[in-house]
């Protein structure tokens, strides 16, 4: 899928400026100067340019991207490969551009090489970052798993094409609050147990510190510009998925381990972000009471900056792939979560 007027060209053009000079991003990236590498879903790059067209420089054979000009999606790039994709036929003048990674492909690394102006135009300096920042931590519900499918029955190809982190409830909530955001979501993983007991040697926390998810031992280097006022954690749907034969867990041992690990994770987030960041722990379905207990324990231990929010399922149709939340559901959740975040002592 590409826009009318879009023109993919093999091979990457080299922009005149480094990526960090011409593009604003809040996502986790490894800055290599002329390019940046990234893995997490929902990572976005925002720029400004003058002229009638723009080239988007990408090297990614695994993920899909939306290209938005002046707030409108003008192209969806499906596993574009090593290319400069041109958007042309625009009115002559100043424009904004946004490139966003739609889906999760944790086994692959993506490369963004910036923007190239069409003849007679120019790439302008990057937009200013927003004052507000929110991090969303979670699983498939956080990253928009199959949310634009319109059906629960999806094959793997349909799942890849219909996952859109840019309309996940986290992205929509952040836009309502005019906040930059990170969608640090990984499908299928939990706090201590993954869906159906798969991959028992790893959990979400195995990968959380990374920039590049497929690189063992990789650690994200915060450039100093990421200081979220709010971190929203929604992990537990996979932990409490039905136990399978042969697993060592019992319901009681799983619940106890989950609560312990969740409390440890909140303490780690507090150390990472400092006392001023509010931590919001989301209760959903089978994990709700356990999360509430963890929040209560953190409050009793003196951390009043940890808050509980219950994700109400009323009005949700779960028409995403495999019964996940749909784009409709993501809008409903965002319309409920944004007012809650406004009610917290952030000054928002």
Name these PLM-found stretches.
Residues 1-137, 141-162, 348:
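N-terminal secretory targeting modules
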Residues 40-42, 106-108, 152-252, 285-289, ...:
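Conserved SGNH/GDSL esterase-like catalytic core that processes O-acyl groups on lipids
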Residues 70, 206-348:
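Alpha-helical cap/lid subdomain in secreted, periplasmic
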Residues 79, 186, 311-313:
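Active-site donor-binding loop signature of nucleotide-sugar glycosyltransferases
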Residues 98, 135, 182, 277-279:
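A structural signal for isolated positions on well-ordered beta-strands in alpha/beta enzyme cores
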Residues 136, 181-183, 308-310:
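Conserved beta-strand scaffold positions in the cores of enzyme catalytic domains, especially
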């Amino acid at each position: 899928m590409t826009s009318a007027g879009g023109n993919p060209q093999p091979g990457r053009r080299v922009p005149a400026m480094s990526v960090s000079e011409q593009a604003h991003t809040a996502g986790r990236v490894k800055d290599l100067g002329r390019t940046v590498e990234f893995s997490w879903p929902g990572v976005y790059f925002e720029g400004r340019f003058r002229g009638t067209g723009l080239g988007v420089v990408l090297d990614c054979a695994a993920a899909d991207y939306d290209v938005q000009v002046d707030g409108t999606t003008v192209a969806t790039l499906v596993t574009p490969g090593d290319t400069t994709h041109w958007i042309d036929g625009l009115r002559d003048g100043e424009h904004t551009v946004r490139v966003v990674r739609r889906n999760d492909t944790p086994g692959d690394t993506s490369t963004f090489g910036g923007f190239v102006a069409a003849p007679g135009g120019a790439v302008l300096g990057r937009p200013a970052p927003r004052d507000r920042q929110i991090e969303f931590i979670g699983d498939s519900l956080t990253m928009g798993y199959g949310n634009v499918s319109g059906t629960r029955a999806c094959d793997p190809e349909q799942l890849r094409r219909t996952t859109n982190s840019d309309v996940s409830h986290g992205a929509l909530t952040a836009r309502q609050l005019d906040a930059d955001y990170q969608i640090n979501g990984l499908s299928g993983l939990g706090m201590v147990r993954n869906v159906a007991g798969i991959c028992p040697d790893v959990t979400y926390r195995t990968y959380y510190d990374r920039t590049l998810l497929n690189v063992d031992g990789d650690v994200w280097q915060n450039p100093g510009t990421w200081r979220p006022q709010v971190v929203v954690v929604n992990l537990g749907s996979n932990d409490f998925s039905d136990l399978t034969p042969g697993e060592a867990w019992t319901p009681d041992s799983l619940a106890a381990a989950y609560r312990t690990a969740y409390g440890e994770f909140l303490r780690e987030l507090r150390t990472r972000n400092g006392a001023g960041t509010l931590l919001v722990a989301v209760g959903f379905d089978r994990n709700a009471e356990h999360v509430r207990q963890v929040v209560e324990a953190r409050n009793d231990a003196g951390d009043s900056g940890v808050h509980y929010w219950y994700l109400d399922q009323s009005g949700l149709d779960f028409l995403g792939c495999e019964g996940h939340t749909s784009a409709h559901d993501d809008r409903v959740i965002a319309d409920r979560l944004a007012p809650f975040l406004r009610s917290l002592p952030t000054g928002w």
